[in-house]
Amino acid sequence: MNKTLLKSVREYKKQSILAPILVILEVLMEVLIPMEMANIIDIGMTSGDLHYIIQRGVILVVMAMLSLFFGISAGNMAAVAGAGYAKNLRHDIFYKVQEFSFKNIDHFATSGLVTRMTTDITNIQMAYMMSIRLLARAPIMIILSWVMTLKYSVKVAILFLIVIPLLGGTLIFIAKKAHPHFIKVFDEYDILNNSVQENVNASRVVKAFVREDYEIDKFHGISKYVYTLFTKAEKIVAWNSPVMQFTMYVVILLLVAIGGTGIIHGTMGTGELTSIIVYALQIIGSLMMVTFVFVMIMIAEASTDRITEVLEEVPEMQDKADAVTEVKDGEIIFDHVNFSYAGEGGNLSLKDVDLHIRFGQTIGIIGGTGSAKSTLVQLIPRLYDVTEGCVKVGGIDVRDYNLEALRDQVSMVLQKNVLFTGTIYDNIRWGDENASDEEVQRMCKLAQADGFVNEFPAGYNTQIVQGGNNVSGGQKQRLCIARALLKKPKILILDDSTSAVDTKTDALIRKAFREEIPNTTKIIIAQRVSSIEDADQIIVLDDGKIMGVGTSEELLKTNDIYREVYESQVKGGEDDE
């Protein structure tokens, strides 16, 4: 467990400290119990002193009760500390991910983050809970049991001094041999989770292409490999128990031999031999405990590295101390912008983009697949940072803004529309959680969503399930547009967000934009010329470069790319969807 992860203990420090203290008290009682048993046998029973037997018996029962109390209390404290620690870790990772830029998120697969927040944190929780309890218990038990053994027999104590390091070393060797296999197992868990996630998310595609058998075989292959790796690790760990059992029986035989000789010669009592055997079992049991915890820590170590990787990831975008907190207007300037997803030295996705968009204008962006249309607009709310040049909003470099303030004034409807589990009201209110029902309904009317929403039996209280699988693609797009409008932003970006909407509805949405939100800068990325031909300016992108800027009429005269797209759609006819 490293310093980064231990910071998440926070309010559970008290339980984390009390658990080992209670364990030590429990161990103290357990170590004293065999001594009292020896006294009862060797003194009370030998002399036939019933009063002594009862007196010591009462003390024995009290010790047992105290041991039980301390043990239960320690277990409760350890459970609370472990569960609380895991809760804090999940919170810290989730909070950290919220701070990530797109570039940070690109470092981790979604399935990898899910595995970290579930399986990995559970492993760490178990290791932490065992560590604060068992790692305190085992060493104290071994030391005190050995000291008590030394009190009765130096020979037996020396025997333990030989056995303990040999056995401990063997068990640690076994655990270390298993560790690399556990690391591989958890790496494969990511792949397994990714396979499940892909299959569930794309279940309709799988069924449409009748690929169920292929997906089953793929999942079976990954699952079998995880099974093979885990089996290899467990086969190594399985040596623990036989080694411990063998050692235990050998030690007991030696103890009986040494103790029997002592009893015959009168140098050791029967009770003392009984106590020594109990101490031997306590020492061996403690070594087994240490090994078990050590194996768990080995498993958790792989998880620790993966969790630490997320927590120590430095968010690429951080607010300056004097960050600007107010966006004046929706004017946008791209000043000789170059951008590469790989950073400096990588292949440029945007090349020397120089652009001025006035506040309140409607801008259309068109270009072929891979021309960096989405990349261009993602720089405006600073989802990525430019590699060279700068992007200004309201006359200020976006890097000088407080991120929350900037993004609060930029509404973006992404290509992949996402709705969340909850009612339609809940989903639209992502734009403004304090919005009234009337405001939500008004924005849905602007987005041409009000009609189909009112056709649902529950209207705006209709539950959205599984990311919006109970609404059509066009309906989902309109709900996402309504959500974006509810923010009342200074800049509205539609990234191919009306592609599943028929041309008539598309035209009504654009008309609503012109009439109802004239003081919002609107950027519309589209594949259909009809979606942008009435824009104030149209930007033609090709391979990350601006190949033309102007109205539809101007571009038809001066730009071959735009003219080719326009003519192919007009002559071919646009399909109403």
Ranges and model annotations:
Residues 11-14, 99-103, 119-132, 136, ...:
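An intracellular "coupling" helix at the cytosolic face of ABC transporter transmembrane type-1 domains
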Residues 47-48, 83, 91-115, 119-121, ...:
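Short intracellular "coupling" helices and adjacent cytoplasmic loop segments at the cytosolic face
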